[in-house]
Structure formats: C-alpha cells, structure tokens
Amino acid sequence: MTTEIKVERGLFDEVMVPCYNPMEMIPVRGKGSRIWDQDDNEYIDFAGGIAVSCLGHCHPVMVDALTEQGNKLWHLSNVMTNEPALRLAKKLTEVSFAERVFFANSGAEANEAALKLARRYAADVHGPEKSEIIAFKQGFHGRTFFTVTVGGQAAYSDGFGPKPGDVTHLPYNDIEALQAHMSDRTCAVMMEPLQGEGGIVPPTPEFAQAVRELCDKHNALLIFDEVQTGNGRTGHFYAYQGLGITPDILSTAKSLGGGFPIGAMLTTAKLAEHLKVGTHGSTYGGNPLACAVAEAVVNEVTKPEVLAGVLEREALFRAGLEKINAKYNLFSEVRGKGLLLGAALNEEWQGRARDVLVAAGKQGLLVLVAGANVVRFTPSLVITQQEIEEGLAKLDKAIATLV
C-alpha cells in the first residue's frame, strides 16, 4: 500500500530542476477550453498548453482513440512497425507535400531530424563543404544542442560551451541580407512560417517567395519549422499552404498529438533515401498510443468546418482585442494568423507582457507571452464563442487592474 503524497506548489521547488517557474495554482482537470485547479477554481484557457491543445482538453475523439489503443498495444520500438503509425504517416502524406515521414517525440526531435537530413543530403550529393545552415534572429527551433544553436536567441543557447558550427543567423524578413550572404556553401535555410517565440512575426509574401527562390538558386533545402504553426493553427493544415511556397522538409509536433507527445519530420521520397537504416532513429518514435491519438486529431482538424472555423474565431479575437484596446490603449498591433495571435504592447507598456499574464491568471484566464512585449494567444481551434467572450471579459478586467 502506497502513502498518498500531498501535492502543493511548494513540492515543485523541492523535487524539480528549477528551469521552470510555474504558476502557483495546480490544474487537476480540464474540459474543452476550461480547466479547474485543486480548489475547483475555473479558468478559461487561451494558452492551449503553448499551441498544443488544438481540440481543447479531453476531446472525446482523443479520449476514445487513446482508450481503444491502450487496450491493444502500447509500445514496440522500431524493430517492428505498427498500424497506427502507418495510418498516421499515410494521412500526413495525403494532407501535405510530403511522401515520407519520420516520427519522433517532440518538436525539437523533429527539427533535429530535419537538420541531420539536410546535412546528410548535402554531404552525399554535393560534398562536405556544403554544410552551412542559415536561420533567423529571434527564431526558435527547440532545446537540443543543435536546435537551440540554430534558433536565433542567444539567451537560450549561450552558457553551454562550444556550439555546433556553420550556423548563420540573419534578420527575418530581410531579403537583401539573405541575398548577400547565401552561397553555394549553404546547405539549408530553416525558418518558421510565422515566428512564434520571437514575437508572432509573419513573413512578408515577398520574403517567403525570395527564400524559396534563393534556396533553388543555390541548391539549398528549405526547412519549415511548423511545430507551432501546423495542424490547423493558421486556418490551413500547414501554414506553408497559405504562403504559396512549398518546403523540402517540414517539422511538426505540438498540436499534432493534441496534448499527447509526438513529433514528425515530413519530406520527399528523394530526400528520405539519404537517411538509410542506422543513420537516425528513435526508440519511442511512432509509438502506437501517440500515433493513434494523433490520427484522431488529424482526422478531426482536417474537417473543412474546423479549418474554416479557425478564421471565424480569429475574427472574434481580433474584434474583442480591438474593443479592449479602445478602452486602455496598450496594444500597438495584433499580429499573427488564425489562432496564433500576438498583441504587441505599445511604447508605454514595453516590458509588461508578463504583468498582463499574471493579472489574467488572477482573473481566471490563461494567456502566454512571446517575449517581454507581446501577449500571445494560442487557444483550442474549436474554442466556443462563449468561451472566447468570457475570456476576453476576464482579460478586460485583468488589464483594468494594471492601468
């Protein structure tokens, strides 16, 4: 018989590595876009676990898929394949440019696989001197040593000793800088089709087109990090589908599993041939439980009414934020696409995004930040109009306590 451990926020400080600073409250259950803490206080969720809970909490199709698979088969490793993994891979090739899929456990792992594939392909086809990876300042691609180096934020990558080499960071949306630097040594360009952690910054159509054209000119691969933008978040299943260009490699995770950990790298048959047996792998990648849940998520999100509903909900958010801004004048603009939105604070409110987050939490609303100057919203793709209106009313009250 085990002794029940009393779980309070203070236990975090006793037993957890202090690389996080979680809120004081501890959620214990959720339904739709609402969660409840240990004291049964209710919160509206505009954070979605950082763009993960695309169908909200405990959506029936996800619960049913997990329960059904949980009674069949949990794990095999890639010594064998499994039905959920193959069905999901087939589905992902049907809804994207991809012909081949590699499964991982997270966005960082999917990006690691993407970068390794790009380097491997360049070495095999063009020789070892073609190894430069270009990424963009304020980008974010994960926390592994390779991906955090490729991400363009020194605050995350400094302090761990020598970094992987031949990585160059250029300004996002700067065509001239990219033209001036890119060469036949460039192996790949890695970019987010909408910068998330960097402040919810969309690419200009001209920049996106120029990146694709320059990659073609220099025989470099274009890698799209769609960990945050993918799986319906922008109103397209993948954000590239709204930009008029197609990457060579794409990474996806976060909302792919709707809250169950899974990541994937998508690419073409031609490129995939360069990751032969033994060149890369993952013990848990393609796990039957994860793939069964993700298959249910993809089937739900790809419904036309769900994707169309994302843009309808975006309009509700923008209208509500505009109304709040008319009262308090704290936002300079609302950026983003679909349900990946960032309210940029104006000059008087610079550095106070976390203040808004904390104040919102006290009013029963969960939001995010994207840097010190942007309040970020990444709710469920199926959040109801009532939940949006309730949440915006709570945000209004929260801001009123700060002015």
From Swiss-Prot:
Cofactor info, note text: Binds 1 pyridoxal phosphate per subunit.
InterPro entries documented for this protein: Ac/SucOrn_transaminase_bac (IPR017652), AcOrn/SuccOrn_fam (IPR004636), Aminotrans_3 (IPR005814), Aminotrans_3_PPA_site (IPR049704), Class-III_PLP-dep_AT (IPR050103), PyrdxlP-dep_Trfase (IPR015424), PyrdxlP-dep_Trfase_major (IPR015421), PyrdxlP-dep_Trfase_small (IPR015422)
Pathway: Amino-acid biosynthesis; L-arginine biosynthesis; N(2)-acetyl-L-ornithine from L-glutamate: step 4/4
Catalytic activities: N(2)-acetyl-L-ornithine + 2-oxoglutarate = N-acetyl-L-glutamate 5-semialdehyde + L-glutamate
Main location: cytoplasm
Needed co-factor(s): pyridoxal 5'-phosphate
Binding residues for N(2)-acetyl-L-ornithine: 143, 282
Class of this enzyme: transferase
UniProtKB keywords: Amino-acid biosynthesis, Aminotransferase, Arginine biosynthesis, Cytoplasm, Pyridoxal phosphate, Transferase
Compartments where found: Cytoplasm
GO molecular function: identical protein binding; N2-acetyl-L-ornithine:2-oxoglutarate 5-aminotransferase activity; pyridoxal phosphate binding
UniProt-listed GO biological process terms: L-arginine biosynthetic process
Signal peptide stretch: none
Gene3D superfamilies, per the entry: Aspartate Aminotransferase, domain 1, Type I PLP-dependent aspartate aminotransferase-like (Major domain)
HAMAP family assigned: ArgD_aminotrans_3 (MF_01107)
NCBIfam families found in the cross-reference section: arg_catab_astC, argD, PRK01278.1, PRK05093.1
Family from the record: Belongs to the class-III pyridoxal-phosphate-dependent aminotransferase family. ArgD subfamily.
Miscellaneous: May also have succinyldiaminopimelate aminotransferase activity, thus carrying out the corresponding step in lysine biosynthesis.
Name of the protein this chain belongs to: Acetylornithine aminotransferase
Gene coding for it: argD
